[in-house]
């Protein structure tokens, strides 16, 4: 154990606190700036009115309208294009085709099935 004595670092309490203060003082301007920015530029969240109101059914309806609208149609077209390119290069498999076509059927068929089962228009 005596061989480890010469490698032992003797830190007193004052030098340890000085080292910590030197390390922390480097971050002080950033912390103060971040606190000031968050206090003085606070405002209402931009996502608080994304649901279109307080009704959860309205929020779900807005999401369904987004997915089944032009965005969903673009995704379906891109999926079919990806299958065509994969088929052209010989990389298409039955699993890939079934996954993409099945996803398209589920995405657009769920709305029709839900309206049929609930009696909606």
Curated annotation (Swiss-Prot):
InterPro entries: TrbC/VirB2. It holds the Pfam family TrbC. Keywords: Cell outer membrane, Crown gall tumor, Membrane, Plasmid, Signal, Transmembrane, Transmembrane helix. NCBIfam families: PRK13857.1. GO terms for biological process: protein secretion by the type IV secretion system. Interacts with host plant RTNLB1 protein. Its main location: membrane. It comes from Agrobacterium fabrum (strain C58 / ATCC 33970). The gene is virB2. The chain crosses the membrane at residues 65-85, 94-114. This is Protein virB2. One of its GO terms (cellular component) is cell outer membrane. Coiled coil: none annotated. The keyword Nuclease does not apply. It is a multi-pass membrane protein. Residues 1-19 form the signal peptide. It is found in: Cell outer membrane. Belongs to the virB2 family. Disulfide bonds: none annotated. VirB proteins are suggested to act at the bacterial surface and there play an important role in directing T-DNA transfer to plant cells.
């Amino acid at each position: 154990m005596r061989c480890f004595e010469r490698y032992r670092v003797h830190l007193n309490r004052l030098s340890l606190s000085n080292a910590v203060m030197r390390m922390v003082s480097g971050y002080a301007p950033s912390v103060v700036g971040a606190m000031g920015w968050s206090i003085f530029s606070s405002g209402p969240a931009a996502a608080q009115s994304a649901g279109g109101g307080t009704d959860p059914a309205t929020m779900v309806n807005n999401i369904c309208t987004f997915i089944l609208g032009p965005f969903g149609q673009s995704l379906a077209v891109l999926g079919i294009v990806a299958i065509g390119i994969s088929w052209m290069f010989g990389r298409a498999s039955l699993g890939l085709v079934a996954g993409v076509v099945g996803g398209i059927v589920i995405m657009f068929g769920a709305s029709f099935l839900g309206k049929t089962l609930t009696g909606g228009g």
